[in-house]
């Protein structure tokens, strides 16, 4: 399916989420290498969004696109997810092809407010990457435990789900299809009765029908409330 899409002449760019959001999929090096070969074959440029690169769990390992890249490509990322600094609006990118890089820089300099990054964002990123490793390690353990808590509670309440934590990200992509619920009815119950807003899967297209995306990147006390309210909302419809 991917090769068929890349072979179409109207498709010029592959937008890649690595790790993938919302599923939490970690692409293996072999998978990425195959993608790179196909993109080079059909002259398709790649833009790889790797903002969740630090949030990879267990034995899974993140492979940056730069390690397998061919042809035209860009790798975009930020410390905002890892260090909770999105309000500083800082991000950075790598562009492998010199002509593309120079063209991008030229276009960037012609845009008001974009030609120079925020000094505060730069300072925060430098500090985070130079001194934040112990904090990030602790955060990773905390978030991984949060995801295990979700699995424990959901599977305890609804064994047929058999939900497993994702390979990456602190976002729980939960398949509720075994429960045969109406997505919009569940959202109505969660918001109006349980007072909790959880991202419905249909926000991401028809493939997301029957799923919800729960953010585990928060204090355990808040997560516990959210999970218990999700369980209560589901029970209301069963």
Predicted regions and their residues:
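Active-site phosphate-binding strand-loop segment of PLP-dependent enzymes
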Residues: 1-57
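Structural signature of PLP-dependent enzymes
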Residues: 104-111, 128-151, 179, 183
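Active-site C-terminal subdomain of aminotransferase-like
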Residues: 95-121
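Conserved glycine-rich beta-strand-loop-beta hairpin in the small C-terminal domain of fold type I
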Residues: 122, 126, 141-151, 163-176
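Structural motif of enzymes handling amino- and sulfur-group chemistry
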Residues: 89, 116-139
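PLP-dependent enzyme catalytic core of the Aspartate aminotransferase-like
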Residues: 3-7, 189-198, 204-238
């Amino acid at each position: 399916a991917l090769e068929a899409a890349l072979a179409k002449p109207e498709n010029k760019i592959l937008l890649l989420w690595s790790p993938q959001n919302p599923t939490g999929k970690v692409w293996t090096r072999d998978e990425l290498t195959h993608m790179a070969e196909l993109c080079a074959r059909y002259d398709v440029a790649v833009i790889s969004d790797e903002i969740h690169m630090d949030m990879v769990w267990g034995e899974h390992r993140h492979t940056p696109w730069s390690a397998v890249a061919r042809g035209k490509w860009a790798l975009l990322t930020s410390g905002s997810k890892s260090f909770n600094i999105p309000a500083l609006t800082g991000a950075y990118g790598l562009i492998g092809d010199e002509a593309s890089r120079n063209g991008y820089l030229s276009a960037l300099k012609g845009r008001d407010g974009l030609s120079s990054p925020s000094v505060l964002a730069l300072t925060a990123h430098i500090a985070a990457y130079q001194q934040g490793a112990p904090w990030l390690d602790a955060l990773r353990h905390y978030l991984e435990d949060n995801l295990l808590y979700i699995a424990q509670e959901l599977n305890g309440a609804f064994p047929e789900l058999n939900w497993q934590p994702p390979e990456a990200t602190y976002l729980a992509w939960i398949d509720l299809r075994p429960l045969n619920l109406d997505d919009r009815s569940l959202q109505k119950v969660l918001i109006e009765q349980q007072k909790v807003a959880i991202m419905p899967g249909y926000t991401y297209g028809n493939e997301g029908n029957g799923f919800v995306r729960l953010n585990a990147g928060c204090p355990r006390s808040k997560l516990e409330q959210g999970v218990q309210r999700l369980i209560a909302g589901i029970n209301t419809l069963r």
